[in-house]
Design a protein with these regions (language model features):
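Short S/T/G/P-rich N-terminal loop/turn motif that feeds into the first structured element of a domain
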Residues: 1-76, 80-96
Length: 96
């Protein structure tokens, strides 16, 4: 079952291009597909490129945590270089 989540990432100075290069690479896409459906992902970046936000539809929350916290051997080297910090939020729809 997919779960709507929001991931906020603060990037180290000047590392946006390196981060996005990995996220869009074959290797990065393969890892992202283990976590969520990339086709449904909604992404945003701050004007100064110091932070990114992704609304994802996760199907493997543990893989998401591993992808971000350094326990995934594929993402660890790049995230050690580019990621300053991150936060993960569960999203729930509010009926009006």
């Amino acid at each position: 079952m997919e779960k709507e989540m929001l991931v906020l990432g603060k990037l180290k100075e000047g590392k946006f291009e390196k981060f996005m290069g990995f996220m869009q690479s074959e290797e990065g896409m393969a890892e992202r597909k283990k976590i969520a459906n990339p086709e449904k992902t909604v992404a945003a970046v701050t004007p100064d490129k110091s932070a990114v936000m992704f609304k994802i539809f996760a199907h493997n929350e543990e893989a998401l945590k591993a992808f971000l916290n350094g326990s995934n051997p594929v993402s660890k080297p790049i995230f050690d270089e580019v990621m300053e910090s991150y936060q993960i939020y569960d999203l729930s729809k509010v009926n009006s």
